[in-house]
Amino acid sequence: MSSSTSVDVLDYYDEEVVRRIMEKHGYGEREALAIFLNSQTYRMLANPEMEMWQFGPEGIFDIWESEKITGSPKNSAYLRMV
């Protein structure tokens, strides 16, 4: 079993979630990428055992935004349903 989510999957989510962060919050690309890569949401996405990619980019963005607002990604409706 792999110890991290595939690079292709992470690259896809990096691009999609960072685009949403830039659009909604007005960050530049580098800043948005750094914010996402340093988030607990990203660490959860990179953990293959959590299978976070199943939520899609919209779900991952929602989880990240919940983390930004409340301090915990676990406050997202996506994770409360699990």
Language-model segments: which ranges?
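C-terminal alpha-helical interaction appendages
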Residues: 1-82
